[in-house]
Amino acid sequence: MDKLAFGVGAVDFQARINYDRLRTERLAKTQAALKEAGLAAAILTRTENIRYTTALRGPFFAPQLRYALVFAEHDPIMYELGDILEGQKVHATWIKPQNWRYAYCWLNGIPGAAAVQEEARRFAQAIVRDLKEHGVYGERIGTDGIDEAGRAALAEAGVQLTSAMPAMLQARSIKTVDEVNCLRLAIAISNR
């Protein structure tokens, strides 16, 4: 393998990792995999899938605090936790301003059964609203792991879920030039 000819900093005089292209190609690969799997959209809750499709990092301390609705033929919608939403909007300018939403979460049942059911109902209503707005309500929708409260609320709202994990694994299986260069850079740093 050739030596890595660039470092971690960004410069205007060398072709290095192109992060705009990285984000664009990752989303395109995901959308192609969703289409191939016959999915109109996917509700993604797993950190690695949100990161892959939106390039967003966030809190990792509890499941389903945030989620992304990634469409096969439209731009993704990001549902973000509380005040984190405002900070993400400032820095993640590649997500369209109209595609940010506040997330609904129920913290694995900590608030109690009635609160969980109500929050899951609001979650499902928000998802259904966006599915209808994009013309895919009633089509096959994938997920990479929504808990029972979320699944039940979506089913009650008429959303039938199937696994999006095969499509996500397919999308991530073949690396782009920028993904390979990210891996090479990480290896170069760790081999010092």
Question: What spans do the regions from the language model cover?
Answer:
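N-terminal glycine-rich flavin-associated loop
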Residues: 192
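A composition/biophysics-driven feature that prefers long, compositionally simple stretches
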Residues: 1-189
